[in-house]
């Protein structure tokens, strides 16, 4: 079989050329990173869980008319996606104060915000993904005013969808981040949700206990990350609650 051409390798995923023009194969790694990759570990099974969860969320968004880059899951670790022109921004939607917002504004973690607050960060690991305003985005040409209007609309629709989905299984959606890319159909351009949606990119707290079920488990050494992600997948019905562990094949005499 011909060796696939690697396009890009990031902290959590590898992108390969897809089988058809305009497609990409997105491979989910087991690598976990925090604090802009200052803290690293390999968490067995994390890539499989994130692949399945991102498929679940992207498919659900498609069903309610939110465009995404997702085409189909190929196997346990890979999915086929549309090639997009990524806008170099992380779009963060916050429903409750946590993380950098708590530190920046002196808000107690878990404080409910008056309404969902949308923030933008410029994607640059060397700079620590700095917070930017719409003025920066327009001035540096990262996105047009129409793009910004569309990004805001997409982000809030994703928030409505994810918040309701999580609330239904006893999980609070504290905040999340998405990336958005441009796709072109002839002369027509539209924006789609790209990258991934998983516990790597969301803050998820158990409503009753406040227990964290996201990457903060790794950031703050709060327990087993794979167990937390598995619980999210099981609550959402993405994985069966009594899944049989995968074992090595045994020989039958």
Swiss-Prot record:
Belongs to the SAICAR synthetase family. PROSITE patterns: SAICAR_SYNTHETASE_1. It comes from Roseobacter denitrificans (strain ATCC 33942 / OCh 114) (Erythrobacter sp. (strain OCh 114)). SUPFAM superfamilies: SAICAR synthase-like (SSF56104). It comes from the Bacteria. One of its GO terms (cellular component) is cytosol. The keyword DNA repair does not apply. This is Phosphoribosylaminoimidazole-succinocarboxamide synthase. Its EC number is 6.3.2.6. Gene3D superfamilies: ATP-grasp fold, B domain, Phosphorylase Kinase, domain 1. The gene is purC. CDD domains: SAICAR_synt_PurC. One of its GO terms (molecular function) is ATP binding.
């Amino acid at each position: 079989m011909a060796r696939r051409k690697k396009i890009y390798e990031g902290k959590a995923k590898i992108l390969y050329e897809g089988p058809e023009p305009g497609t990409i194969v997105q491979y989910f790694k087991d690598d976990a990173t925090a604090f802009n990759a200052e803290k690293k570990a390999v968490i067995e099974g994390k890539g499989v869980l994130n692949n399945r969860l991102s498929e679940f969320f992207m498919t659900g968004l498609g069903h309610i008319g939110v465009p995404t880059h997702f085409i189909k899951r190929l196997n346990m670790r890979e999915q086929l996606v549309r090639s997009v022109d990524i806008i170099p921004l992380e779009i963060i939607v916050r429903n409750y104060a946590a993380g950098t917002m708590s530190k920046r504004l002196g808000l107690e973690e878990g404080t409910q915000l008056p309404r969902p607050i949308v923030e933008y960060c410029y994607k640059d690991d060397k700079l620590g993904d700095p917070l930017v305003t719409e003025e920066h985005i327009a001035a540096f040409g990262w996105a047009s005013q129409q793009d910004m209007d569309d990004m805001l609309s997409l982000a809030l629709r994703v928030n409505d969808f994810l918040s309701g989905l999580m609330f239904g299984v006893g999980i609070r959606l504290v905040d999340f981040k998405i990336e958005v890319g441009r796709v072109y159909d002839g002369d027509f351009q539209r924006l789609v949700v790209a990258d991934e949606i998983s516990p790597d990119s969301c803050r998820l707290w158990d409503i009753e206990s406040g227990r964290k079920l996201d990457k903060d488990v790794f950031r703050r050494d709060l327990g087993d990350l794979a167990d937390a992600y598995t619980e999210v997948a099981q609550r959402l019905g993405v994985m069966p609650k009594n899944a049989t562990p995968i074992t090595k094949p045994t020989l039958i005499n």
